[in-house]
C-alpha cells in the first residue's frame, strides 16, 4: 500500500506543477485586439470616403446585398467578390468576420460595453420563430430568385462587368453614395440595429434574429475545420466560457459533448479562450462540426421566453411591420425594416402581457409589479400607442404606393 500511496502523491504533485505552470502562463487579451480590429473598420470607412473626396473616384462600397444583382443579372460587382471572399474564408477559418470586422458588430459591442459601464446587463431574449428570420431572409434574397428563374424556364445570365455609365454596378465610381441610403437613414439604422436592439433585446440580437449574411456564414461555419477545441484533461466544466460568451453559446456543454464548439452561432471572438481559468480552450484545426449542433437542445439550450401563442403574435406583427416599412418613402432599407419588425413584435407581446400578467419586464425596465403599472410601464403604454398609429399610417402609405405602382 505504501508504494501506491507514494505514487498517488507523486501523481498529485505532477498534476499540481502542471496546473501551476498553466495558471501562471500569461493569457492573451483577445478583447483588446478585437476592439482594435473593429475600430479600424470605421477608420477604413473614413479613409475610403477621404480618398473619394480627394481623387473624385474610388472603389465602390462593398455592399454584400449586391450578390442578388449578380445572381439575377450576372453583373459581377465588388460587393459580390467581397462576399465570396468572406464565405470561402469562413469555410476554412470559421466565423471570424462577424466579430472582428463587421461594422454593425462594432455598434452592438460598443453599446453592450457602455451599458456594462453603468451597471446594466440586458438579458438576451430567446425566441423560437424569430430564429428563422435570418435563414428565411437569406433564402428570399439568394435562392428564391433562382427558383423563379427555373419556374419561368430562364437560363442563368452570362457573367459580365459593367462600367460606371450604368450608375450602380462598376468597381470604380465617382459617386460614392450611389447605392447607399441617405446619411440620416444610415444613422437611424445604426441606432436601431446597433444600440436599440442591444438594450431592449440583449447583446448581439441583430446577429441572431436579423442578419441574413450571418445565416450564410453559419452554414459555411459548419464545414469549417477551424474551431474552438478543448483539452479534456484540463477542462473542469466550471462554465466560465459560457458565462463570458456574449453570443449566448453554451460553450461548456458543447466541449463536454463534442470536444469542440459546434454551435454555428459561435463568432470566434475568443473570449472563452482568454477567460478559461485552466487554459483548456484553443482555436485549432480538425474535423468540422457539420450538423452536430442540431442534435442538442436547441439554439440556446435553455427554455424559450415566449409561448407558442406569443410567438405566433410576434410573427404576424413582424411581417406586418416588415411590409409596412420596407421601402417606405423610397428610403427605408431592407435590413432596417427587418430590425424594426423584430423590435415591434417584441413590443406587441409585451403590451399583451401588460393586460394579462401581474409582473412584466422589458430588458431592465419593470413595467408592471404586483399587478400595478409602474412609471416606465405607463410611459411604455403611451409610446406603444403612438408606435401603433405610426405603423398603421406607414402600412396605409405602402398599400397605396403598391396599388399605385400596379396601375
Regions found by a protein language model. Give the residues of each.
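Short linker/helix segments within small regulatory modules
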Residues: 255-267
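Non-ligating segments of multi-cofactor redox enzymes
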Residues: 2-256, 274, 279-407
Amino acid at each position: 500500500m505504501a508504494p501506491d500511496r507514494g505514487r498517488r502523491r507523486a501523481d498529485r504533485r505532477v498534476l499540481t506543477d502542471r496546473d501551476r505552470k498553466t495558471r501562471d502562463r500569461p493569457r492573451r487579451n483577445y478583447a483588446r485586439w478585437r476592439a482594435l480590429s473593429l475600430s479600424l473598420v470605421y477608420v477604413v470607412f473614413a479613409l475610403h470616403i477621404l480618398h473619394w473626396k480627394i481623387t473624385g473616384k474610388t472603389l465602390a462600397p462593398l455592399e454584400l446585398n449586391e450578390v442578388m444583382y449578380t445572381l439575377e443579372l450576372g453583373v459581377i460587382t465588388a460587393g459580390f467578390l467581397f462576399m465570396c471572399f468572406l464565405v470561402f474564408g469562413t469555410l476554412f477559418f470559421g466565423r471570424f468576420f462577424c466579430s472582428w470586422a463587421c461594422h454593425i458588430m462594432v455598434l452592438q459591442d460598443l453599446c453592450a460595453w457602455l451599458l456594462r459601464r453603468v451597471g446594466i446587463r440586458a438579458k438576451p431574449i430567446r425566441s423560437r420563430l424569430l430564429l428563422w428570420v435570418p435563414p428565411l431572409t437569406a433564402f428570399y434574397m439568394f435562392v428564391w430568385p433562382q427558383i423563379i428563374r427555373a419556374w419561368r424556364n430562364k437560363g442563368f445570365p452570362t457573367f459580365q462587368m459593367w462600367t460606371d455609365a450604368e450608375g450602380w454596378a462598376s468597381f470604380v465610381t465617382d459617386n460614392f453614395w450611389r447605392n447607399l441610403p441617405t446619411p440620416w437613414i444610415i444613422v437611424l439604422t445604426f441606432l436601431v440595429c446597433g444600440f436599440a436592439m442591444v438594450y431592449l433585446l440583449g447583446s448581439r440580437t441583430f446577429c441572431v434574429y436579423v442578419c441574413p449574411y450571418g445565416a450564410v456564414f453559419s452554414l459555411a461555419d459548419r464545414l469549417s475545420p477551424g474551431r474552438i477545441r478543448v483539452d479534456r484533461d484540463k477542462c473542469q466544466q466550471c462554465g466560465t466560457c459560457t458565462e463570458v460568451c456574449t453570443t449566448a453559446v453554451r460553450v461548456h456543454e458543447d466541449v463536454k459533448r463534442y470536444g469542440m464548439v459546434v454551435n454555428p452561432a459561435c463568432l470566434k471572438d475568443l473570449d472563452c479562450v482568454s477567460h478559461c481559468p485552466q487554459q483548456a480552450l484553443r482555436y485549432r484545426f480538425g474535423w468540422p462540426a457539420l450538423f452536430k449542433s442540431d442534435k442538442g437542445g436547441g439554439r440556446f439550450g435553455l427554455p424559450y421566453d415566449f409561448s407558442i401563442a406569443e410567438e405566433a403574435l410576434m410573427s404576424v406583427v413582424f411581417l406586418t411591420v416588415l411590409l409596412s416599412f420596407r421601402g417606405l418613402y423610397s428610403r427605408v432599407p431592407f435590413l432596417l425594416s427587418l430590425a424594426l419588425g423584430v423590435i415591434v413584435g417584441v413590443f406587441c407581446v409585451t403590451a399583451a402581457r401588460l393586460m394579462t400578467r401581474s409582473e412584466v419586464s422589458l430588458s431592465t425596465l419593470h413595467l408592471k409589479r404586483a399587478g400595478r403599472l409602474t412609471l416606465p410601464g405607463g410611459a411604455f403604454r403611451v409610446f406603444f400607442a403612438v408606435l401603433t398609429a405610426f405603423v398603421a399610417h406607414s402600412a396605409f402609405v405602402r398599400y397605396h404606393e403598391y396599388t399605385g405602382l400596379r396601375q
